[in-house]
């Protein structure tokens, strides 16, 4: 079905707005994925705070022009699905990586974070970023372990001091 000029402008504006507010983006090829599977992906994306859209290459190139994701322009070939992470930089990468594992025909092309292209082979770098809560928990555990280590060293020093005095 042919899109009119106004429809194309609306799509470009919508994707551009999503790109401006996004932390990262992932580009994938969704050829061979059924409608039901795509519906499941879109549902999971909404829950994860990820914007997912299948867009024509010329329109998505126009939409990302002037954003951090302009570096992805070379990957816009063939059927293009683009996913923008709005809340966490690794959310879209994690979501699409899990989906690609379950669906053999779904292929991740590349990702972008802070204006840098991340090849599909290195998508784990982005997907494994801890969430805010996970990073906070890791920090607290490190601080807790450090204070426990200091306490143990203090007790050992007191023991050594008492042994020398005796």
Swiss-Prot record:
Domain of life, per lineage: Bacteria
GO cellular component, one term: large ribosomal subunit
One Gene Ontology term of the molecular function aspect: structural constituent of ribosome
A Pfam family of this chain: Ribosomal_L10
GO process terms (BP): translation
Secretion signal, residue range per the UniProt entry: none
Keyword annotations of the record: Ribonucleoprotein, Ribosomal protein, RNA-binding, rRNA-binding
Subunit structure comment from the entry: Part of the ribosomal stalk of the 50S ribosomal subunit. The N-terminus interacts with L11 and the large rRNA to form the base of the stalk. The C-terminus forms an elongated spine to which L12 dimers bind in a sequential fashion forming a multimeric L10(L12)X complex.
Protein name in UniProt: Large ribosomal subunit protein uL10
Species the sequence originates in: Shewanella woodyi (strain ATCC 51908 / MS32)
Phylogenetic lineage: Bacteria, Pseudomonadati, Pseudomonadota, Gammaproteobacteria, Alteromonadales
